[in-house]
Structures are given as structure tokens and as C-alpha cells.
Amino acid sequence: YGATVDLVDTTKVGRNERVAQLAEEMPDAYFASAYDDRFVIEGNATIGDELAGRNFDAIITPVGGGGLISGIVTGLCRNGSRTEVYGAEPLLGNDAARSLKAGRIIVNETEPMTIADGARTISLGKLNWEIIKDSVADILEVSDEKIAEAVRMYFGLANLKSEPTGAL
């Protein structure tokens, strides 16, 4: 298919900086953020579509840049669901929780070094924030110790092999 894989050592260069470099090298390419992209949000909204018919009291979902949670909320809302949605993010990278409390996007100074590597984002995406700020009940902050405990618990009780971000 002609794809090129570009492995980025994030200890030497940030993801966003490398993407900016690649965008200059390939001006005709489409950059799809892993979270702050309308197509990504809409894809994740299909999860909310499916959950809407289940009549849950609440849903808790991991938060990094906000693509998953904003998509789920979008799907739930367009189906008329009143299910409350909560986010869970690493305490070491709690920009989403701080943003929700402050009423504006808070940016981490550096990429958080948490075991939940799928949530190592500097901040929520702008598109995601517009959805999250009015639709998410709360964002829970989880220590790396509790995340590791959850990974072990999933395996011990249900033989589920979860990566740390999924265990949030």
C-alpha cells in the first residue's frame, strides 16, 4: 500500500514536532490526530451508538487526548441516552481533570511519564474539549500504582491481558 512507518523516540523529539516535520516534507498528506480529528471522534462515536441501547447508569472510559471519551459522548447524546460518562486518566498526566475543573484546556509542561502510555498526552484536543466540557460528569485521577493493580486484577480474576491505559 506504500505506507512508511516512522518510529519516533519521544525522549528525543516530541510526537507533534515530528508530525510537523513530516507535514512540511509531505504537504499533500492528510494528518489524522489520534484524538483531535473529526473522523476519529466520529469513529469512536459508534461505540456510544452501541452503548446507548444498553441503559447503563454510568460509563467510565480512559482519557488521553480525549478522542475516545468525546466520541462515546457524541454517540450517546445523538441517541438520546442519559448515561453519565466519566473519564479516568493517570494522576501523572491529569490535564483533563484539571481542565474540567478550570473550565479551560490545561496543558502539561511535558509528556507525562506514566505507565499508561496511551494517555501520555500534553493536553486534550481542541475538538475534544468542546464536547467534553459540557458532557462529561467528571474525570477521575488514577495513580500508577492503582493502574498496575488493575492490570494484575484483570489478569488474576478474568485472565484478561490489559495494557495499562485500558485498565484505567
Description of each model-found segment:
Residues 1-168:
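PLP-dependent amino-acid enzyme catalytic core
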